[in-house]
Amino acid sequence: NAMDNTSGSAVARMTAMNAAGTALQTAITAYQAHVPITLTADPSTVERTVDSASIFGVNHRYAFNGYGSFDPDTMRVKDDFTALYKQVGFGSIRYPGGTISNLFNWKTTIGPRAQRLKQIHGFYNNPGQGGIEPNFGIGEIATFADEVNSEIVYVYSLGRGNAQDAADLIEYLNAQVGTNPNGGIDWAKVRADNGHPQPYNVRYFEIGNEMNQAWANSDGTASQGYWTTAVSGGSEQAYTEGGTASFTKQYAVSLEDWNKAASVSDGKAGLTRYMRYANVNPKMNGDDGAIVDDPSFVAVNKGSVSVWVGNDQSNEQWRIVDDLETAGAGDKVVQVDYSTGALRFGDGVHGAIPAKGQQVYVSYTVDRDGFVKISKAIKNTTDQINTAEQRTDGTRHTANVYTSYESTGFITRMANLNANQWYDGMTIHPYSGTPTGATAGAWYDDAMKKAETAGVNRVKEYVRLMPAGKVPVISEYGIFRDTSALVRSQSHALYIAKVALEYVRLGSPYIQKHCLIDWYSSGADSLGPTQQAVIQAVPEDGASTVTGEGRFGFFLTPSAYALQMLGNGIGDSVLTSTLGSTPTLGNGATSLSALVSKDDDGNLRVIIVNLDRALGRTLKLNFGQDLSGRVADVQTMDAAINAENTLENQDNVTPVDSSVTFDAATPTVTVTPHSLTTLKIRPRAAGTINAAPVITASDRTITVGDAFDPLDGVTAHDAEDGDMPLAAANVTADDVDPDTPGTYHVTITVTDSQGATTSKTFTVVVQAKEGGETPEPEPDPSPGPEPTPEPAPSPAPDEETDQAAHQKPDGKTNGQQADNGKTKLSHTGASVLVALTCTAMLAIGGGLIATFRRKRS
C-alpha cells in the first residue's frame, strides 16, 4: 500500500509538473502575442516597381461559354457577372486559359459566329468530351477586358500553332491597320472589319500551358505534351527547338471534335478526317477577297503518309491517290491534302466509303516549330510594327515571351543554345498539393505549410537558377488538388494572401489565381476541383454545365475578396521591409508576413497576413518618418477558417472597413487571428507646410586631453520624419583641437525627406587643466526611478470565436492603452508571465525535490 501511495503521489506530481509547464508555455505565448513586433520600412528604398493596376489577376477559360459567364445570344459577358468582376477589380485576365488553351486555333474563333469552328479541349479524348463552341473568342474577351479595365495575358497554342501563325496573331492583336508588317493578309484590317479598329496592345505571351507535363501514352487524356512526345530527343528538346514528329497509326480526327468515339466513320459519302498535329494553314487572300487556305503550304511532310481503316485489333491499309475522280466505286482509296492535313474518302461512286463505326488510322511525319522560333516570330513582328508605326511620342509595343516548360533543363538548354534573349521568364504554377488533416484546423495548418514548401520555395529555386533579368511568372496557383469545401473558405483566402506577397517580392510581373469561375459543386472535372474558382456559378433551372448555356447565379468567395484587398492594398513602389521577429505555427510555417509599398499619391500601403488561428499580433510601424496625426484606412477580413459564402448568404465573409488616426510617431496596430489586413496611410492633409528639422545642441566645455565627439549630446527631430539619425556626414564644420586651450565651433547640418535643411552651430571651450589634476565628478542629484504601478487585471479572452471582439485593427487592443505610441501590457501579458513563471518553477522544483528525497529514502 505504501508503494501504491508513493507511486500515486509521483504520478500526481508529474501531472502537476506537466500542467505547470503547459501554463508556462501559455503565459509565454500570451506575452509574445502582446509584445509589438516592429515592422520596419524605408520609404526612400524601393525594392521593386510593379504595375499595381494589373499585378493581381486571374486565369479565365473560354470554354463552355466562359463557364456560364458568357451569353451566346447577346455575344457578351453577362451583366451580373461583370458587376462582380468589377467589384473585385481583377487587374489582368489570362486567356484562353490553361490546359484548355493548348489546342486553341485563334483564326477559327474570329469573325461572324456562323463562320467559326468548334475548338479542341486540351484533354480532348476523355469520356464525354467533345468540340467546344467558339462563342467566347478573341474579340469577345478583348471587348470584356476593355470594359473592366483588365490587361490580357495571352496563352499561345504551341500544340497547334507555328511561327507564321504566331506572327499573324501579333499583327491581329497589336498592329495598326495598313502597316501589315509581314505582308500577305492584313490581319489588322481583319480585326477592324470584325469591329475593333484600334489594336488590343497585348504585351504578355505564354507559349503553351504546362507543356513539361508530357506523358507519351496519355495524349488527349492527361498529357500536355501533344506532338512534342513524338520527336526524337524528348519533349523538352522538341518544345524548345522543334523537330520532326513521327506518328504511327494514330487515329485521325474529326475537324471539330478529336474525341476518338466522335472520329469514327459516319458511313456517309465524302468522309473527311484530319491528322491531329498537322501544322495549321496560315491562309491567304483569295481572288474574291475572301480568306482561304494556302494550297502551297506544307502542313505534313509529303510522302510520309499511310492510311488504314478498321479498328484497333484489325485494320486494312487503303491506297493513296492524287484524285478520287479516277477511282472506281469499290476502290479503297484516300486522297491526302498536304496543305491542311486532311484525308478525303470517296462517295461510293468514285472511291469506297469507310463503313460506319470504323476508325481511320494514319502514319505521318511533320516538322514543327519550337519555342525559340515562335518567340522570334513574336518579337520580330513586334519590332516590325514599331518600325512601321514610327511613333513620335516615345512609346513602343513590347512583347514579353514566357516559356511554359517548367524545368531546369529548359534553362540549361536555352543557355547552351545561346538563346537566352528569346525568353523573358518562366511560367510557374506552384500549386500546393492536397492538404491533409482530420479537422479544419489541421487541414489549415498543413495548407499553410505547403504554401511555403510547394507554393513559395519552388518559385525561389527557379529564380535562383534563371539568368539575371528573367522573371518567374505565376499565372496559376492555389490549393490544388482538393475538393474540400475549405477550398472555398477563409482558409484559401489566407493561403492566397500569404503566397501572393512572396510572389510580388520574387518579381512576377503578374500573379493570376486559378481560376476565375467554375461550377458550384462538391466535385471536379478533368481540369480540377470546381471549389478553387474565386467566383462560383450556381446553375438554375434549365442551365447546362456541359455547354455553359442557361441562367446561373454568381457569388464571390473569400478568395475573391482577398484578391480585391491585395489589388487595392498595393502601390507601384514596393519598399524593402523587415519584421523584427517571425512567429510560426506549430508545424514551423511562418505565421506573420507583411508587405509595404507606396503609391504616386503619397499613400503608404501595408498588407499584413496573420495565420495564427488563436493569437492576434501587434505590430509597431517604424517607417522612418513621423506617422502621428496621419489617417489610415483599414480593411480586415478575419472570418472563421471554415467560413464561406453561398448564393443565399453572399456576405457571410467580406472585408470590414475602418479608419484610425495615429497618435504616435511609430504607432502600433493590432491584427486579429487568421486575418488579412490592409492599411492605406494617407499623406498629411493638403496645405500642411513641411517643417524644417530641429537640431538640439548646447555649448560645451571640455578639459585639455578629454575625448571629444562632436555628435555627443546632439539630436535632430523632424515633424514629418521623426527622429533623424546623425552620422559624421552631418558634421559640416569642426575646428576643435581638444589638446589646445581655446574657443572653437562645430556646425551640424541635417536635411529631411522633403528637402528642408537646418544647420546649428555651437561653441566648444577647451580649458587648461587646473594643477594638472582632473576634478572629481559632481554627484548626480537626480532621484531614482519611480516604481511602476501594478496595472489592473483584465479578463483573459475566450477561445478563437471571441478573439475578434478583444482585438481591433484600430491601433489599440482591449486591455491596452497608448502612451506616446508605446503599448503597456495588460495583466494577461508580462504580469501573467511573471506570476505563472514563478508558480510553474515552484511546482516543478517541488516535484523534483520530493522525487529526489523519496529515491534517497
Regions found by a protein language model. Name each.
Residues N5-A19, D721-F762:
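Serine/threonine-rich, repeat-prone extracellular segments and beta-strand-based repeat modules
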Residues N587-S628, V634-D638, H674-K680:
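Carbohydrate-binding surface patches
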Residues V35-Q250, S254, V366-Q421:
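N-terminal catalytic cores of secreted or lumenal carbohydrate-active enzymes
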